[in-house]
Amino acid sequence: MGQSVSRDDFIWTLTEQPHMSRREEIVKKYPEVKKLFGVDPSLKYVVSSLVIFQIFMCWLLQDADWILIILEAYFCGGIINHAMTLAIHDISHNTAFGNKYPLKNRFFGMWANLPIAVPISVSFKKYHVEHHRYLGEDGLDTDVPTTFEAEFFTTAPRKLLWLALQPFFYGFRPLIIYKKAPTDMEILNAIIQISFDLLILHFFGVKSLFYLLFGTIISMGLHPSAGHFISEHYAFKEDQETFSYYGLWNLCTFNVGYHVEHHDFPYIPGRDLPKLRAMAPEYYENLLKHTSMMQILTEFVVNPAMGPYARLKRKPRVAQEFYGNYQLFEYVEGFLHHIGVYRLQKFAVNVFDLNNNSKKLN
């Protein structure tokens, strides 16, 4: 169990990620795949039901014993909260309202964020774009572990600890690898989330808030739901960059297990990814796949070939960008233009200048 990992570096590759070329081939061979693009009409209702259910659980557990709260957080709330993080993942691809309504998708992501107790929705979207566009590229894809993680978590006990601490590495790694300016939407996301947490604390007490927060943390660490963090891109086979999981846990994770399919077509909603696989099976059947979340986690811990270094990595194609997109400001500015505020401002300036000129003449 104390055996150290056999890798001492990432798996550096000069090849481009395979997803774009496979996407082009599939679209050319099966043009009907485009019918799967777009909105998941059920997503709004499923997400809203889970948010309301978690608020109900907060009411139900406000006077419960701490042991019951911990058990409920692991077996119930944790599964739901992790599902909400993956709903946010789906929403980040605008599958709730479509690409024509990005602001609606961002606000709906904040709604899905509420039971998680930590503001992640907008920040996740900001970094997830790079994960798809620059998969595995050094300094751009923050899904790849830092050198410290890879150098320190090298034995089975340490890898187990790394899995337990995954929510903290996942949350703070972007601040180390790729610093970006906070955007207006991120600040709004934080304000809304903190306000919700304070309301839970005020009306239901500390036990209910703990139920939400502990459920989020534990479900992203030593929990079957967290198996997808490892299954998606860790190199169980060195010449394959992305892996899919086909098992029952997809029912609790918005089909995030269909990860090869997702990277091939990010704008197909999670619920329709099995249709993509059925439509073009020859592109996916020969790839290594996973069928058990517990097996994924166990093999990662005990197999010396696996560890944080077991990731394909590339040299970056572009430089980092510090400044973010101030999306809300753009919409506010557009709204002010629409209702004529700027025309009124221009008129007032002209009147003011006219008055000043008249006074000078007098």
UniProtKB/Swiss-Prot annotation:
**TM stretches of this protein:** 45-61, 71-91, 107-127, 160-177, 198-218
Q: What is its main location?
A: membrane
What InterPro entries does the entry give?
Answer: DES1/DES2 (IPR011388), FA_desaturase_dom (IPR005804), Sphingolipid_d4-desaturase_N (IPR013866)
Return the EC number. Answer: 1.14.18.5, 1.14.19.17
> One GO BP annotation here?
ceramide biosynthetic process
Q: Where is this motif: Histidine box-1?
A: 89-93
Q: Does the keyword Lipid metabolism apply?
A: yes
Pathway field of the UniProt record reads: Lipid metabolism; sphingolipid metabolism
Q: Where in the cell is it found?
A: Membrane
Q: Where is this motif: Histidine box-3?
A: 259-263
UniProt KW keywords: Lipid metabolism, Membrane, Oxidoreductase, Sphingolipid metabolism, Transmembrane, Transmembrane helix
MF terms from GO for this chain are:
sphingolipid C4-monooxygenase activity; sphingolipid delta-4 desaturase activity
What is any one of the record's Gene Ontology cellular component terms?
Answer: membrane
**Catalytic activity field:** an N-acyl-15-methylhexadecasphinganine + 2 Fe(II)-[cytochrome b5] + O2 + 2 H(+) = an N-acyl-4-hydroxy-15-methylhexadecasphinganine + 2 Fe(III)-[cytochrome b5] + H2O; an N-acyl-15-methylhexadecasphinganine + 2 Fe(II)-[cytochrome b5] + O2 + 2 H(+) = an N-acyl-15-methylhexadecasphing-4-enine + 2 Fe(III)-[cytochrome b5] + 2 H2O; a dihydroceramide + 2 Fe(II)-[cytochrome b5] + O2 + 2 H(+) = a phytoceramide + 2 Fe(III)-[cytochrome b5] + H2O; an N-acylsphinganine + 2 Fe(II)-[cytochrome b5] + O2 + 2 H(+) = an N-acylsphing-4-enine + 2 Fe(III)-[cytochrome b5] + 2 H2O
Question: Residue ranges for motif Histidine box-2?
Answer: 128-132
Annotated membrane topology = Multi-pass membrane protein
Function, as annotated: Bifunctional enzyme which acts both as a sphingolipid delta(4)-desaturase and a sphingolipid C4-monooxygenase. C.elegans contain specific sphingoid bases, which are unique or different in structure compared to the sphingoid bases found in other animals. Two examples of these distinctive compounds are: 15-methylhexadecasphinganine and 15-methylhexadecasphing-4-enine and this enzyme can catalyze their conversion.
The UniProt entry's sequence similarity note says: Belongs to the fatty acid desaturase type 1 family. DEGS subfamily.
Name assigned to this protein? Putative sphingolipid delta(4)-desaturase/C4-monooxygenase
**Organism (species):** Caenorhabditis elegans
Q: Which gene is this protein's source?
A: ttm-5
